[in-house]
């Protein structure tokens, strides 16, 4: 049964729209946990467009579940993460002009740099994941480098319809099994919602789904605790 990681970046987006102190993502992380979240995910971007440094350090001190820090593989973020000591770090690609993360990390083309980076994080007892597209070459490189986890990018699956979505789903299923056989723990996320998450959650060997936007959108109508609870029930029926 897949567990649920709740991304609270969009709470911070609302706060930063007015450069004020509310809503506080730290407070909403507590509500997400009450709703059944198994972990809390935040992306500390280089431009600090939503989550801020104070958020991640307060979250580390206050949440009862696990903290997953998404970040680019930069020297600044390495220093911050080694000071914070989150439960997990997920390395993601990052472009300043993007609205949200647009694709997976190219582990294959950056193996030498990423191997040293991952080794440094693991020396601080931080488990490390790579956010990658469901491609065998990226999975192979992730295993070779020493990542503990991968997070399969489900954005394309979420955008497609009909037969094209089915084909992409098969790629994710095959990638999950392939990565699991290589000893990687497999998470998945990006674009998942109340209509499409169940099929991903039902894949054997999927460990956790990371979901943010759709839960926060649903929370506007029913509150965050209930929105998380509904998603948790949805992905736990398999």
UniProtKB/Swiss-Prot annotation:
GO MF, one example: pyridoxine 5'-phosphate synthase activity
Keyword Cytoplasm attached: yes
GO cellular component, one term: cytosol
UniProt site (Transition state stabilizer): 151
EC number annotated for this UniProt entry: 2.6.99.2
Binding site for 1-deoxy-D-xylulose 5-phosphate: 9-10, 45, 50, 100
Top EC class of this enzyme: transferase
Domain of life (superkingdom): Bacteria
Keywords carried by this UniProt record: Cytoplasm, Pyridoxine biosynthesis, Transferase
Predominant location category: cytoplasm
InterPro entries noted in UniProt: Aldolase_TIM, PyrdxlP_synth_PdxJ, Pyridoxine-5'_phos_synth
GO annotation (BP), single: pyridoxine biosynthetic process
CDD domains assigned to the protein according to its UniProt record, in alphabetical order: PNPsynthase
Database matches in HAMAP family: PdxJ
Subunit structure: Homooctamer; tetramer of dimers.
Family the entry assigns: Belongs to the PNP synthase family.
Full protein name: Pyridoxine 5'-phosphate synthase
Source species: Prochlorococcus marinus (strain MIT 9515)
Upper classification of the organism: Bacteria, Bacillati, Cyanobacteriota, Cyanophyceae, Synechococcales
